[in-house]
Amino acid sequence: MPGKLLWGDIMELEAPLEESESQRKERQKSDRRKSRHHSESEERTETRENGVTDDLDAPKPKKAKMREKLNGDTKEGLRFSDEFSPSHKSRRKDLPNGDVDEYEKRSKRVSSSENSHKSSDKAEETLTREQKEGAFSNFSISEETIKLLKGRGVTYLFPIQVKTFGPVYEGKDLIAQARTGTGKTFSFAIPLIERLQRNQETIKKSRSPKVLVLAPTRELANQVAKDFKDITRKLSVACFYGGTSYQSQINQIRNGIDILVGTPGRIKDHLQSGRLDLSKLRHVVLDEVDQMLDLGFAEQVEDIIHESYKTDSEDNPQTLLFSATCPQWVYKVAKKYMKSRYEQVDLVGKMTQKAATTVEHLAIQCHWSQRPAVIGDVLQVYSGSEGRAIIFCETKKNVTEMAMNPHIKQNAQCLHGDIAQSQREITLKGFREGSFKVLVATNVAARGLDIPEVDLVIQSSPPQDVESYIHRSGRTGRAGRTGICVCFYQPRERGQLRYVEQKAGITFKRVGVPSTMDLVKSKSMDAIRSLASVSYAAVDFFRPSAQRLIEEKGAVDALAAALAHISGASSFEPRSLITSDKGFVTMTLESPEEIQDVSCAWKELNRKLSSNAVSHVTRMCLLKGNMGVCFDVPTSESERLQAEWHDSDWILSVPAKLPEIEEYYDGNTSSNPRQRSGWSGGRSGRSGRSGGRSGGRSGRQSRQGSRSGSRQDGRRRSGNRNRSRSGGHKRNFD
């Protein structure tokens, strides 16, 4: 006999069942109680939701009531859903045709409904504060735009977008600064599109642009235009820059433009020819404003927009300035374009670190002659054969030479100003799609390239200004991902490195070149992954040969040799972990107690080793904490030193990675072990400060050279400081 709770519901589904008079009366009482309970429950629910009970509302259909009861959180609904347990379903098997299926369907609906409520509650609990603040429902964003944003993978607004949406949407002037990779383009694109679509007028042919976005590079202009196009289907977006056809741009002007993005040079050309009318501008955006208002672009920007601005007029276009780096001079120069009352959003502010917080900054000391080979090793260890990397060089010639570097095993392509625009676009498209893994570029790729999959950025030398370093390193670690930036330097460039640390608020981790073990591990992983692409049919052809190899060499040795050959690592040439020079091995000598300087280590070496062995020791420097030293010896001498070393409290070893050291400076940058710096001492092995004549002379020369370099560097810095900043000069290193 079914339970009483189900009786009233199954009456419509079942054939009439025989029942006694007492059972019939009991059933009628139960139905009346249930009906009264349901009506009271619905009244309470309506009162809670609406504040008052509306007696004029039409009664809800029975199916709707049932759905509300099943999906609600009332005890009645929960009890009802409990009735559809597996045991109850098994008891209904004898019902007429269709009844079991109907109950099972209801059971599944109830279960899935409860599960969806639980999962939504759980999802709401796991939302971060950033996601809650950036929820689309908090902003005036249309459903159409939200759909397009989700198509781009954007599910909520990032902090810079949250902070700037209101001021931009309300038409206020704004200066905004945020770190690279935090979504600055959408910060102005989303509210501007919503504002234009809200006030959209009748679409006319040949209409003048209402929004002008100026960017310093073609690549950035292209990226910004794409971001606009991705989130609007109603507005016309055009992108003008050099190296492309004038005629196609003229056709776009004739058809009408709502949002114009471009570089100053090409837009100025269209203005001077009279083809482009900017008299109807309502919004002006300068992206990467620190570069747009610098001497290289400031005059062109002024020529383009000056007619749209009148002194102290509230009718001037809304002005929006965005960048990751905003020196103080930017604010001073920008005031002539801003209304007297403007908003300022700064997500960097007085924080020490100006660069992206998702990037790890490494520095490798390396002579320029060794750099191409070491860069190949760095790519292998930190990026692998599948990762994507960007290498920045200072000149176009360096870019071409680096891309042809035989030590770079991955396919690499060039990007610089002398390459035709059509080829530049093909190159960038291929890099985005992963057709090749390494992009070698000048500063044209430092700003605006938004490719989250970039794992590694390599700067072949410290850049000429801090802003360039920040923007270059910001090509990785984007959209919440982490990345690595490796900066190569020579001893004479230590001052530039320290200046970048100070101004960017970062600390470089000094590391050595990738060790042999690092390379073996990385290459073996790539080789193992490559085996997965071999088909079983191909494997069958090689089974006899494999069997012979196993019999001759053994399974492990045979496979190890095969992996070494596949990875191209059949031999390794040791390098100094200190200077990256070939043919040297770095060794550490750890002291049982703290030492004052390297002279203590020299004394211990002279006491335990032959003079011939000691004469090969070079580039000695203190370990962090003064608990020992590290130094280089020729590869041929490393085993002899270890064999001679015994009966000492000091521990001599060969490290796999460069330990933390006090900064090393090789005064003459020579790799000859007999030419010592001031720290390394003379041939007798004593300290250069107090040692033999040769060591002392070399030490004095080293220190004098250092002081001379400091004086020259000081004069250069003084010259830079005396330079006028009114035009937006950046801190340069000559």
Curated annotation (Swiss-Prot):
Comp. bias (Acidic residues): 11-20
Q: Which InterPro entries match?
A: DEAD/DEAH_box_helicase_dom (IPR011545), DEAD_box_RNA_helicase (IPR050079), GUCT (IPR012562), Helicase_ATP-bd (IPR014001), Helicase_C-like (IPR001650), P-loop_NTPase (IPR027417), RBD_domain_sf (IPR035979)
Q: Where is the composition biased (Gly residues)?
A: 679-698
Motif mapping: Q motif: 134-162
Which keywords accompany this UniProt record?
A: ATP-binding, Cytoplasm, Helicase, Hydrolase, Isopeptide bond, Nucleotide-binding, Nucleus, Phosphoprotein, RNA-binding, Ubl conjugation
Domain Helicase ATP-binding: start-end pairs: 165-344
PROSITE patterns annotated for this entry? HELICASE_ATP_BIND_1 (PS51192), HELICASE_CTER (PS51194), Q_MOTIF (PS51195)
- Listed binding positions for ATP are 178-185
Q: Which Pfam families match?
A: DEAD, GUCT, Helicase_C
Biased region (Basic and acidic residues) positions are 38-51, 67-86, 115-131
**Sequence motif DEVD box, residues:** 287-290
Positions carrying Phosphoserine: 41, 81, 85, 113, 119-120, 515
Q: What does this protein do?
A: ATP-dependent RNA helicase that may play a role in various aspects of RNA metabolism including pre-mRNA splicing or ribosomal RNA production. Also acts as a viral restriction factor and promotes the activation of the NF-kappa-B and IRF3 signaling pathways following its stimulation with viral RNA or infection with RNA and DNA viruses. For instance, decreases vaccinia virus, herpes simplex virus, Zika virus or dengue virus replication during the early stage of infection.
User: How is this protein organized at the quaternary level?
Assistant: Interacts with C1QBP. Interacts with the ubiquitin ligase CTLH complex through GID4. Interacts with TICAM1.
Q: Which PANTHER family match?
A: ATP-DEPENDENT RNA HELICASE RHLE-RELATED, NUCLEOLAR RNA HELICASE 2-A
In Swiss-Prot or TrEMBL terms, this protein is called ATP-dependent RNA helicase DDX50
